[in-house]
């Protein structure tokens, strides 16, 4: 009996010790993660909100709170190291941006006093607030203001992105001034590090480069669905999904890929409202890859290969861009046929997801070869409340076969004709090519 009690006590000690050890490991791990996700106390963030964010209260919500590039990832500032800028944040933009000048200078001075001359002040601006930050940077370049030490800039949804921002597309355009919008052109080069974060198809930072009607219509829908202040809040810049990163000198450009074209979102909204998603989604999935090709033809590229070159809007689409699109058409048609067979529902507004970024002077495109996961915002929206009958299997198979035939015919049209004669290469059938990651709807 005594031995049995000793063994019982020993087992209890082992269990308690193991539990305590695991608890300590988990606690320490969470503590370490918390430290890794927080900007050092020697640095500070000054935030300038977008329209109607007069107190800069929404900046800390961006990208789940981790919106400051530090140590190869995105982190949040320490709780007592965020300094919001108070300004009118309204329309017309020109007078509102001018109103934010002095409050920004004051807040940078306060932050500098708190962290000292050796710390870094990160100036983060969203949309209209990014213009306030851009003007402040230009004053630093001109020597009219002194930040008192190192500063870095983070521009979210900025119209000054060199290749994509609407101000860069239409530099010094006079008529905009009549509406209170005076284009100041692309962001001015600076010796300070800058990070531009843009949501794909948001026309403020990702406006079409060419007069493509489909691209312009999609951009208009993108303004309604993607430019709203809460859009970036649910995404995580440290989540390995669809994001494209390009580093040029001191500047880092990030394009957050969208799941679906904003142009098709009204149809998805109506489909959700009347519980017909199970029918409409296979059809939308069938046409979206090809429609996306047509929309993307209105941009210089979709792989962010040259985001730092200021590019004006042009009425003419270069023949090379048209040829690139035609070469990708067979793969898009095949992808559409495959989507029609699967027909996975996706009814929420175009979500955005991102992957971690390493701020090194190298180019990197997120390595995953599949579309990004959807950030669900409402389960009731994504799931029809009542079962919906699908069309007869035979009818869907007929449509699918017809689409496959079209894809095969188009693909054969673009195949080089075989040589005739004894030296001709043996005939072979090429496998259907899928659209590349940069051309898929992410």
Question: Where does each model-flagged region fall?
Answer:
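Composition-driven, intrinsically disordered low-complexity tracts enriched in small residues
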Residues: 1-123, 134-442
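Active-site loop->helix "elbow" adjoining a glycine-rich segment at hydrolase catalytic centers
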Residues: 127-130
């Amino acid at each position: 009996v005594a031995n049995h009690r000793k063994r019982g006590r020993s087992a209890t000690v082992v269990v308690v010790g193991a539990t305590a050890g695991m608890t300590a490991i988990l606690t320490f791990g969470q503590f370490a993660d918390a430290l890794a996700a927080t900007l050092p106390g020697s640095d500070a963030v000054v935030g300038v909100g977008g329209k109607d964010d007069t107190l800069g209260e929404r900046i800390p919500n961006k990208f789940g709170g981790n919106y400051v590039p530090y140590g190869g990832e995105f982190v949040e500032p320490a709780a007592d190291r965020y300094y919001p800028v108070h300004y009118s944040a309204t329309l017309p933009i020109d007078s509102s941006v001018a109103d934010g000048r002095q409050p920004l200078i004051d807040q940078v001075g306060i932050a500098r006093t708190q962290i000292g001359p050796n710390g870094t002040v990160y100036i983060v601006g969203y949309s209209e607030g990014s213009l306030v930050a851009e003007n402040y940077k230009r004053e630093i370049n001109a020597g009219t203001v002194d930040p008192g030490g190192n500063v870095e800039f983070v521009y979210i949804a900025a119209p000054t992105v060199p290749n994509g921002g609407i101000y860069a597309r239409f530099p010094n355009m006079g008529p905009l001034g009549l509406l209170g919008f005076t284009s100041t052109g692309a962001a001015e080069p600076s010796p300070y590090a800058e990070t531009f974060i843009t949501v794909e198809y948001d026309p403020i930072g990702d406006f079409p480069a060419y007069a493509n009607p489909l691209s312009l219509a999609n951009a208009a829908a993108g303004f309604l669905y993607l430019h709203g202040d809460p859009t970036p809040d649910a995404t995580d810049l440290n989540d390995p999904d669809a994001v494209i990163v390009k580093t040029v000198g001191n500047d880092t450009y990030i394009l957050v890929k969208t799941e679906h074209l904003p142009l098709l979102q009204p149809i998805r909204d109506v489909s959700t409202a009347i519980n017909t998603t199970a029918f409409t989604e296979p059809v939308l999935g069938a046409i979206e890859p090809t429609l996306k090709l047509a929309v993307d033809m209105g941009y210089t590229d979709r792989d962010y290969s040259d985001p730092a070159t200021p590019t004006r809007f042009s009425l003419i689409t270069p023949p090379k861009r048209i040829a690139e699109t035609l070469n990708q058409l067979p793969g898009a048609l095949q992808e559409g046929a495959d989507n029609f067979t699967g027909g996975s529902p996706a009814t929420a507004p175009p979500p955005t997801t991102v992957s971690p970024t390493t701020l090194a002077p190298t180019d990197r495109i997120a390595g995953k070869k599949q579309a990004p996961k959807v950030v669900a915002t409402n389960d009731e929206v994504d799931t029809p409340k009542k079962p919906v009958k699908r069309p007869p299997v035979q009818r869907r198979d007929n449509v699918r076969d017809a689409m496959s035939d079209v894809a095969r015919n188009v693909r054969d049209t673009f195949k080089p004709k075989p040589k005739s004669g004894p030296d001709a290469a043996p005939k072979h059938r090429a496998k259907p090519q899928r659209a590349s990651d940069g051309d898929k709807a992410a």
